[in-house]
């Protein structure tokens, strides 16, 4: 079913990279004013194509359904402080959230009830539902500014285990048994969830400036890092594979309108706020503070398609379970702190129907 009233077909491209224009986004579903403050996270249900949750700095998590192309708010639950992250349980029956009240909360879709199941001593920046240990037990892992990650059994209030991190946790992601944690001071901790309490490998981001986001490959053999300096790095767990296939590249940079004609003046550099991998094709998207998003093919090392600058930064983006829908927020990303925000700053969630032209790897002829 296509709720965007257009087919998901493949069309040929004359080159390996293409720039879109605003007409390519004309059929996007737009949710205006989805929250009273900036959107911090978006997560799709792993069991439904058109249902997702969005957390916000206004202290709420809202659940949306766009099954028929008309956005409908299905539920919301509140916190006393900004909510920084949200994710769904693997069976799609519960939505977890964490934020600046330091609490891990679990919302039950069927009952509409919210329970607090855990606490940190500082804000929870990121969380994931993972399967741990030899028995692949489902639990929640949270990463906090208190320099720890904690594993939680949803049936008890105390963490199953706590792992110290070298610094405050800024980002975290997992695929299969791979968990990658990115912290302040550019530290990267790699954990094999078969042995979840041990850091399998500790390394440092090759990017020179603060890490903004991390995302794992579908194959669970590596991860991508985005930084505040408008760079992305493609990394592999295996040292030999890293030497062969790892690389870094510039992105989310704009021409400085004030530079002199014909000069080689500096570009305007924006943070890479969010990275997401297509669940079927393994290509990926970066979204940035410049208000653009780009689809990339890491294996062929080229951009599949770039999009025009929109009216606000993009703090977060996400694919649905089969990659047919790409959601992104236009919202303040807090990169410039409190002083950079303003009352009239846009606050929008948009849903874009992907085409193979945009997101599928193009084989070499």
Curated annotation (Swiss-Prot):
InterPro entries: G-protein_beta_WD-40_rep (IPR020472), WD40/YVTN_repeat-like_dom_sf (IPR015943), WD40_repeat_dom_sf (IPR036322), WD40_rpt (IPR001680). GO terms for molecular function: RNA binding; ubiquitin binding. GO terms for biological process: nuclear pore localization; nucleocytoplasmic transport; poly(A)+ mRNA export from nucleus; post-transcriptional tethering of RNA polymerase II gene DNA at nuclear periphery; protein transport; regulation of mRNA export from nucleus in response to heat stress; RNA export from nucleus; septin cytoskeleton organization. Pfam families: WD40. GO terms for cellular component: cytoplasm; nuclear envelope; nuclear membrane; nuclear pore. Keywords: Membrane, mRNA transport, Nuclear pore complex, Nucleus, Protein transport, Repeat, Translocation, Transport, WD repeat. Belongs to the WD repeat rae1 family. This is mRNA export factor GLE2. It comes from Saccharomyces cerevisiae (strain ATCC 204508 / S288c). The lineage of its organism: Eukaryota, Fungi, Dikarya, Ascomycota, Saccharomycotina.
